[in-house]
Amino acid sequence: MARFPNPAERPYKLPDLCTALDTTLHDITIDCVYCKTQLQQTEVYEFAFSDLFIVYRNGEPYAACQKCIKFHAKVRELRHYSNSVYATTLESITNTKLYNLSIRCMSCLKPLCPAEKLRHVNTKRRFHQIAGSYTGQCRHCWTSNREDRRRIRRETQV
């Protein structure tokens, strides 16, 4: 992996790093900043799709694998949870329409699309303020959490 000693010249998004290295998302190899393992191809795409920033250690670029993202998102939630509000309350607090707010998934940190925000409104789910930012749940984490709860309920039924 190429080194970027000058902070002004560092790309901070994965597609920009690919351009700087003259490679593609399919061919790039990058390590996790937390566990130091090389990201798998699916994790590279998920990192790019999540619109997360690349971090640099000693001029070397690092991303984060999905396991570490989920772990550190949970730690962030447990340490920095502030409050939970419904969408209408969130709009009145911020004086901004829900569509224009930048809200990420509390589990995988992916930005929520308008359909995922609308799902929170329709099902009367709350958004959570964690570390100063509002979060919800993306479609993938919503369904996987629901399946986990169902499995636990089935296992505990007598």
From Swiss-Prot:
A zinc finger (unnamed) spans 32-68, 105-141. Keywords: Activator, DNA-binding, Early protein, Host cytoplasm, Host nucleus, Host-virus interaction, Inhibition of host innate immune response by virus, Inhibition of host IRF3 by virus, Inhibition of host RLR pathway by virus, Metal-binding, Modulation of host cell apoptosis by virus, Oncogene, Transcription, Transcription regulation, Viral immunoevasion, Zinc, Zinc-finger. Disulfide bonds: none annotated. InterPro entries: E6, E6_sf. GO terms for cellular component: host cell cytoplasm; host cell nucleus. The keyword Transit peptide does not apply. One of its GO terms (molecular function) is zinc ion binding. It comes from the Viruses. GO terms for biological process: DNA-templated transcription; regulation of DNA-templated transcription; symbiont-mediated perturbation of host apoptosis; symbiont-mediated perturbation of host ubiquitin-like protein modification; symbiont-mediated suppression of host cytoplasmic pattern recognition receptor signaling pathway via inhibition of IRF3 activity; symbiont-mediated suppression of host type I interferon-mediated signaling pathway. A motif (PDZ-binding domain) lies at residues 156-158. It is found in: Host cytoplasm; Host nucleus. Belongs to the high risk human alphapapillomavirus family. The cancer-causing human papillomavirus E6 protein has a unique carboxy terminal PDZ domain containing substrate. Plays a major role in the induction and maintenance of cellular transformation. Acts mainly as an oncoprotein by stimulating the destruction of many host cell key regulatory proteins. E6 associates with host UBE3A/E6-AP ubiquitin-protein ligase, and inactivates tumor suppressors TP53 and TP73 by targeting them to the 26S proteasome for degradation. In turn, DNA damage and chromosomal instabilities increase and lead to cell proliferation and cancer development. HAMAP family: HPV_E6. Belongs to the papillomaviridae E6 protein family. This is Protein E6.
